[in-house]
Swiss-Prot record:
Keyword Cell cycle: no
Modified residues annotated as N6-(pyridoxal phosphate)lysine in this record: 242
Origin species: Burkholderia mallei (strain ATCC 23344)
Gene: bioF
Annotated pathway: Cofactor biosynthesis; biotin biosynthesis
UniProt entry keywords in alphabetical sequence: Biotin biosynthesis, Pyridoxal phosphate, Transferase
Subunit structure of this chain's protein: Homodimer.
Protein name per UniProt: 8-amino-7-oxononanoate synthase
Enzyme Commission code: 2.3.1.47
Length: 394
């Protein structure tokens, strides 16, 4: 069999299992109401939790940044691409999210995937042991693999099982790695226990707050701030393309940790820096997130979450007990989940079907993602539409 035929057979196998993923084309800015593939829809697919992706203040900051700095950075951060906009943003991120450390410093990355790879591959290596939650994001899984450390997977959210594994480990370097808000279930890690275990066992605790930053905690400062947690063992990763409404990610930790990443993190060193205009837009986003407007958006989002939980509990399917903007409705089979997604789409509602390997086999689901840009009328549309596709998919 030739190489192309091998791929064609692989794609046929994906189709047979109902697992092919397809992109949709947005013709308008990200928001609750969009034009997608030429059709008007209400979107419940994005991670734009605060509805900032098309905020005029961010758009203008992006445009002004491009006028000042041009369209690209021109190089890596260590070879000419580190602008004043990047430096200013890192100072702002350290001040905003670094309350857990006595000497916080931040490092900006082009993507969350790169930030997670940087933290794990630079802090761990051969001879180290990484303890990773069973439901961690793919970027944390890949970072652990690429680090060449020994990797132990502990049961999801099970701090007691993690404690037992840490007690049995004599590796000189240990890392506990966990999402804060888990992206497919919407539940929150036992962060206070994880911090205590990290300090008890002399381990780093790397937390990925992709779905908590901007939403949780006072002024949206994130999951650690929401729980009032502080520790020199913490390494905090935040994402800027979700609630912040722009792009990129960052790591905040003690200044010594960040300097180590600058010197050793390959996904920071060997890539072109993001355009400075992106950093300008993120700075504007931080100002909105921390403002009274940000508080109002978080309050509205909280009310939407409460209403959605009530809607999903009224269905005969299995809602996951989530108190966050990620509201999954577990259906089970790939085929039934795809049918439900298609029926919702026919009624102008974009609710994506999540299937393996993103979630375990037999737990395919609709992932309803809420935004402060949604209205209660949008939820009423969703509630009315759920009855038909869910019944048809049964």
């Amino acid at each position: 069999m030739n190489p192309l035929a091998t791929l064609e057979q692989g794609l046929a196998d994906i189709d047979a299992q109902g697992l092919r993923r397809c992109r949709r084309v947005a013709d308008t800015a990200c928001g609750a109401h969009m034009t997608v593939d030429g059709r008007a829809i209400i979107g419940f697919a994005s991670n734009d939790y605060l509805g900032l992706a098309a905020h005029p203040r961010l758009v203008e900051a992006f445009a002004e940044g491009a006028r000042r700095y041009g369209s690209g950075s021109g190089g890596s951060h260590l070879l000419g691409g580190h602008s004043r906009a990047h430096a200013t943003l890192e100072d702002e991120l350290a001040a905003f999210s670094g309350g857990f450390s006595d000497a916080p410093r931040a490092l900006y990355f082009s993507t969350g995937y790169m930030a997670n790879l940087a933290a794990l591959t630079a802090l761990a290596g051969r001879g180290a042991t990484i303890f990773s939650d069973a439901l961690n994001h793919a970027s944390l899984i890949d970072g652990a693999r690429l680090s060449r450390a020994n990797v132990q997977i502990y049961p999801h959210g099970d701090a007691d099982a993690l404690d037992a594994r840490l007690r049995a480990c004599d590796a000189p370097t240990k890392l506990i790695v966990s999402d804060t808000v888990f992206s497919m279930d919407g539940d929150v890690a036992p962060l206070a226990r994880l911090v205590a275990l990290a300090e008890t066992h002399g381990a780093w605790l790397v937390v990925d707050d992709a779905h908590g930053f901007g939403v949780l905690g006072p002024q949206g400062r994130g999951a650690l701030a929401a729980h009032g947690l502080r520790s020199p063992n913490l390494v905090y990763v935040g994402t800027l393309g979700k609630a912040a409404g722009v792009a990129g990610a960052f790591v905040v930790a003690h200044e010594t940790v960040i300097e180590w990443l600058v010197q050793r993190a390959r996904s920071y060193i060997f890539t072109t820096a993001a355009p400075p205009s992106v950093a300008c837009a993120v700075s504007a986003s931080l100002a909105v997130i921390a403002s009274d407007e940000g508080d109002a958006r978080r309050a509205h989002l909280g009310a939407l979450i409460k209403r959605t939980r009530a809607i999903l509990r009224a269905t005969h399917w299995q809602p996951v007990d989530s108190h966050t903007a990620v509201q999954p409705l577990v259906i089970g089979s790939n085929e039934a989940t795809l049918a439900a997604m298609a029926a919702l789409d026919a009624q102008g509602l974009w609710v994506p079907a999540i299937r393996p390997p993103t979630v375990p086999a037999g737990t395919s689901r609709l992932r309803i993602s809420l935004s402060a840009a949604h209205s209660f009328d949008d939820l009423a549309r969703l509630e009315a539409a759920l009855v038909t596709p869910i019944g048809a998919a049964a």
